[in-house]
């Protein structure tokens, strides 16, 4: 398994560090905060990934990922829209999903 494909990571771009994922059978708590383009992933209370959307860093990560040819990534991530929840064919459960606007 690739490190940037595991829980808490920015999929195929940045691995979660430190690795704070709980073992199978235990719930993980993930918070993804986006404010003015700055994104932070927190997993089980620890910051594991940080990056800035709409930046050269972001464009470079996309160019070196599997998303380089995906519509919407090279043109730039939109400032509002949809979210996606992802799995890879294994059993998965979600609970207490909350989305709120930061003011």
Residue spans for each PLM region:
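Carbohydrate-interacting regions of secretory-pathway proteins
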Residues: 1-103
């Amino acid at each position: 398994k690739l490190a940037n494909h595991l829980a808490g990571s920015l999929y195929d771009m940045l691995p979660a560090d430190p690795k704070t994922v709980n073992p199978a059978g235990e719930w993980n708590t993930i918070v993804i905060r986006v404010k003015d383009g700055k994104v932070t992933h927190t997993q089980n209370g620890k910051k594991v990934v940080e990056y800035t959307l709409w930046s050269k860093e972001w464009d470079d990560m996309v160019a070196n990922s599997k998303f380089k040819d995906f519509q919407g990534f090279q043109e730039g991530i939109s400032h509002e829209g949809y979210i996606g929840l992802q799995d890879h064919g294994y059993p998965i459960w979600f609970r207490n999903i909350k989305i709120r606007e930061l003011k």
